[in-house]
């Protein structure tokens, strides 16, 4: 799946995150993470992001995550929302997202 337009999901409130997605370079997926808890949970946050984007089939784009201590479920929900807003009419295999 390729991100075709810019989209945003989330907030910068405590225990939430802001996800911005935009078209990127061809055949390249760039992920940028800024988090208040990067030292403690950075690897886990990255794993959740990679897993969610993988299940959605995202292979191209620029993803920026500004985390304020969000739980895994919020990270997944915000990523899914931003990506689905950015791809237009694409058939989603919902069972893969569980």
Swiss-Prot record:
Family: Belongs to the CitD family.
Pfam family, one: ACP
Role: Covalent carrier of the coenzyme of citrate lyase.
Coarse class of the protein's main subcellular location: cytoplasm
Location relative to the cell: Cytoplasm
GO cellular component: cytoplasm
Coiled-coil positions: none
Membrane-spanning ranges: none
Keyword match Ubl conjugation: no
Sequence positions bearing O-(phosphoribosyl dephospho-coenzyme A)serine: 14
Protein known as: Citrate lyase acyl carrier protein
Signal peptide: none
UniProt keyword annotation of Cytoplasm present: yes
Top-rank taxon: Bacteria
Source organism (scientific name): Albidiferax ferrireducens (strain ATCC BAA-621 / DSM 15236 / T118) (Rhodoferax ferrireducens)
Gene giving rise to this polypeptide: citD
Keywords for the protein's UniProt record, in alphabetical order: Cytoplasm, Phosphoprotein
Binding partners and assembly: Oligomer with a subunit composition of (alpha,beta,gamma)6.
């Amino acid at each position: 799946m390729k991100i075709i337009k810019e989209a945003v999901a989330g907030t910068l409130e405590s225990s939430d995150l802001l996800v911005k997605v935009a078209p990127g370079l061809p055949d390249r997926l760039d992920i940028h993470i800024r988090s208040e808890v990067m030292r403690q949970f950075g690897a886990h946050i990255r794993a959740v992001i990679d897993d969610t984007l993988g299940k959605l089939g995202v292979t191209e784009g620029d993803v920026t995550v500004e985390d304020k201590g969000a739980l895994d479920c919020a990270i997944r929900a915000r990523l899914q929302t931003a990506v689905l807003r950015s791809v237009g009419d694409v058939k989603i295999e919902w069972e893969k997202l569980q």
